[in-house]
Amino acid sequence: MLTERQLMILKEIIRLFTESGQPVGSKKLMSELPMHVSSATIRNDMADLENVGLIEKTHSSSGRVPSMKGYRYYLDHLIQPAVLNPMDVATVQQSFGRHYHKIDEIVSQSANILSNLTSYTAITLGPEMAAIRLTGFRLVPLGNHQVMAIIVTSAGTVDNQVFTIPNAISGDELEKAIRVVNDHLIGLPLTVVSQKLKIEVPALLMQYMGSPGGFLNIFDDVLKQASQERLYVGGQSNLLNFSELTDVSQLKSIYNIINQSDDLAKLLELSPGEANSQVQVRLGNEMTNDLLKNYSLMTVNYDVGEHGQGLIALLGPTSMPYSRMIGLLDLFREELAKKLIDYYADFDDSQS
């Protein structure tokens, strides 16, 4: 059982090490602790902390550094989010001050803002697709039996794909099919549109075209593109600043993790309906990829009411200043949520 003084010493070692990157010795602790404690007493307490595996000695110094076990204990029992100074608050608020034209623009830019604020790698995911509605659909003839299918959503995204129309489908049939979509699907959530596309829409289209399969495939393909969750990454190169790896192929593998959407989703362990109202921290030894053993991943959800939830993540060194980063993430998600809620309100007003 650790004493209150030992817990204070552990907390101080982590604070000093994450601020300076230098091992912490008893003399430094003696000058930093809020009460007077002799150097000998501090050394005894540090020995006890080392015996239970919460701190460890480095080869190059007589000081001590936190162990993975020490970081986990600190994160689970001791940490308190830092109170940010007014300059930090103003910087975050001003970063979201500009005008944005669509949801993806806000979410992608937020990753860049957060990476610039922290010098780490930031990852953002927009609000869940369940809340996004279909607001427009059209086909633009390009000639030679080709058309461009265009879908517009309430998130402000415009997705398009070029398709070759089967010879069996006439221009008149296409116009009627578009009318069916506009009459029955516009204004509905994309998840509902996808369901109706399989159940109700085929029967409606059969009234106007003999074989609606070609049109349904076109609409389904561009709908899937519009429904894809989009992960945005800011500060990719920051990840390499804290790597202890020297092998070029391993460094490339780390870089690829955050540039491949499947690998990134796996790293974030995205699960439908799972929400973190508090900042969660996974240390390197708690992640499945050994290349990230010297990194930590911080994640937290942000809430935009009826429009669902999104996610913010920060990937940095295990020795990052957790207290400050948690305080910053809490503020950042509040400001991002406000910006998105304002966007949705403006969008809804423009549609009414």
Curated annotation (Swiss-Prot):
<dbReference type="InterPro" id="IPR036388">
    <property type="entry name" value="WH-like_DNA-bd_sf"/>
</dbReference>
<protein>
    <recommendedName>
        <fullName>Heat-inducible transcription repressor HrcA</fullName>
    </recommendedName>
</protein>
<keyword id="KW-0678">Repressor</keyword>
<dbReference type="InterPro" id="IPR023120">
    <property type="entry name" value="WHTH_transcript_rep_HrcA_IDD"/>
</dbReference>
<keyword id="KW-0804">Transcription</keyword>
<dbReference type="InterPro" id="IPR002571">
    <property type="entry name" value="HrcA"/>
</dbReference>
<dbReference type="InterPro" id="IPR036390">
    <property type="entry name" value="WH_DNA-bd_sf"/>
</dbReference>
<keyword id="KW-0805">Transcription regulation</keyword>
<dbReference type="GO" id="GO:0003677">
    <property type="term" value="F:DNA binding"/>
</dbReference>
<comment type="function">
    <text>Negative regulator of class I heat shock genes (grpE-dnaK-dnaJ and groELS operons). Prevents heat-shock induction of these operons.</text>
</comment>
<comment type="similarity">
    <text>Belongs to the HrcA family.</text>
</comment>
<keyword id="KW-0346">Stress response</keyword>
<dbReference type="InterPro" id="IPR005104">
    <property type="entry name" value="WHTH_HrcA_DNA-bd"/>
</dbReference>
<dbReference type="InterPro" id="IPR029016">
    <property type="entry name" value="GAF-like_dom_sf"/>
</dbReference>
<dbReference type="Pfam" id="PF03444">
    <property type="entry name" value="HrcA_DNA-bdg"/>
</dbReference>
<dbReference type="Pfam" id="PF01628">
    <property type="entry name" value="HrcA"/>
</dbReference>
<dbReference type="GO" id="GO:0045892">
    <property type="term" value="P:negative regulation of DNA-templated transcription"/>
</dbReference>
<dbReference type="InterPro" id="IPR021153">
    <property type="entry name" value="HrcA_C"/>
</dbReference>
